[in-house]
Amino acid sequence: SCYEKGQCVFDDVVNELAPKFEEADGLVIASPVYYASANATLIACLDRLFYSSHFDKTMKVGASVVCARRGGCSATFDELNKYFTISGMPVASSQYWNSIHGAAPGEAEKDEEGRQTMRTLARNMTFLMKSIALGKEQFGLPEKEAKIPTNFIR
């Protein structure tokens, strides 16, 4: 299986992304919104990437960005952020949910608030990555406890 092998059994872009992700201080995931959900190809890629890669993702900063004509942004934003939070990754925030609006190519460029949200996100994510790097140098990473697995059916 992918988990046992330490990489995805389907040898494609996921296995190319994993070492880049491992070296990175942060990860930005962006998706259009379809039926209040992220692009299915992206979700499949993220499922495979996060499941098959065994490196420690703790304190890598994550940020999600979504784009929609009108609705479904908050559900999609939440869906993408779950990859970060289950992996111990701090989530960079902005002044609002990280969404921008537009239906046709070029329309999102007219969303002034959305563009401001993206600029704020970029500054906040950069600050957070620099702060974590400085904290690692001065204090190290927080101590990790051994995981205690729990099944809901006993």
Predicted features by range, described:
Residues 3-96:
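Helix-loop-strand module that forms the ligand-binding subsite of alpha/beta enzymes
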